[in-house]
Amino acid sequence: MLVKTFCAAVNGLEVTTVTCEVSMSRGVQFHLTGLADTAVKESYDRIKAALINNGFKMPTMDITANLSPADIKKEGSGYDLPLAMGILAANGKVESDMLNHYMMVGELGLDGRLQPIRGALPIAIQARKEKFKGLIVPKQNIREAAVVNQLEVYGMETLTDVLNFINGDTSYQPTVIDTRREFYEQQNQFEFDFSEVRGQESVKRALEVAAAGGHNLIMIGPPGSGKSMLAKRLPSILPPLSLAESLETTQIHSVAGKLSRDTSLISQRPFRAPHHTISQVALVGGGNNPQPGEISLAHNGVLFLDEMPELSRSVLEVLRQPLEDRKITISRAKYNVEYPCSFMLIASMNPCPCGYYGDPTHNCVCTPGQIQRYMNKISGPLLDRIDIHCEIQAVPFAQLSQMQPGEPSASIRERVIKARNIQTERFSFLPKQGVSGRVHCNAQMTERMLHEFAEPDTASLDMLRLAMERLKLSARAYSRILKVARTIADLAGSEKVESVHIAEAIGYRNLDRGDWAERGI
């Protein structure tokens, strides 16, 4: 007897519907075909134990199972459930044709309980696309899978539950989640707020500009000056996630297995802060079964690299292409996996190895050569992709105790959203830009767009030229200054880029100054 069940293979964010064919004949062996990896091949032992421990007898026949299409590699343990149901159906335990209408995924424990799998959300999207009536998943994955509308999603605890449901037990009901209500309720619940930060108004302004234009930013200052504290509050002033952005971000976290049992849609922009000992694979993604790295987990959010020069040079250099393309392609011998990674890079660093170069309260013990070597750990091409360089000094305790609470994040966020709306309207008529997709903020402008949208007047251009000569700014700083100036103008509600906007943008290019290591902060 030949039986078919349906499941899915997840490669990156791409999902392929897999047909699980089970056939029985005389014999006592189990054969599994269809380019299955080790975890899938081991499924027979789990299935056998699960069937026996749930009161079923393993058929004493030759069982052949095929996972089609055979040219796509099948990885993970999510094929246990469809294989087990196929064996039960081929053995006459299924009394209906409901197997044809439902996709199912799940790992089986030896006791027959369903264990959670990765990628439940993209699998649910694929099930709806293929017009299945419903999807059966482990109960732990129910909230993320139930996000998909027009699809009946059932969360099951055991193999017996699945069999009873397929045989027509009507006591099982699909899970329904009010996605929009939950999404909007949680959007403004931030752990940190800028009102908690006293002082550092110039740095707050730089972060506001960065948030308004999607600019990458690096903060340079001594230990204890508040770099990490300020960075953690950046998500509270970024524009809220749209539902489309949230769905894309949630899919990435679903594939990586990072969603908690209570999560349906990610409602706030991700903030990822990996340790400086992180490896290349952990940062950009990879492995035998390529998983998303930190840059993809930060998609539509913030990647914070604390003590940036402490990361190995090779790790830093792999950031260059993702920062430009906003996606990462992981190549393997027989296939490629692509993950999106459109994130804001926020970095921090000390000004020197000891950390106190230019600090008024501590003496620096580093030589100019040591300082220069420390700064050179960040290459020119990588620094070229960071629009805003912001210097920061620690606020003395005597001043801290006298300062009033800072401006709340909600007020700053309103200005940021207004500036982003201006940019959205500006770029809405432009076609997609190659691999980067559609431009949606000033940081992504090309040279042609700079001439069209950020061309300064003659007086501003003369001031910029003079500043570049006197401050020894590099040539690569020119377009970065114009992009940041365009954002500052948007925050001010100005259609044109004026001298005051250029002047502020010039102040954000400290590390491009040729005399930086000799002058002190």
Where are these regions (language model features)?
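Walker A/P-loop
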Residues: 219-260, 325
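Walker B catalytic acidic pair
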Residues: 300, 306-307, 318
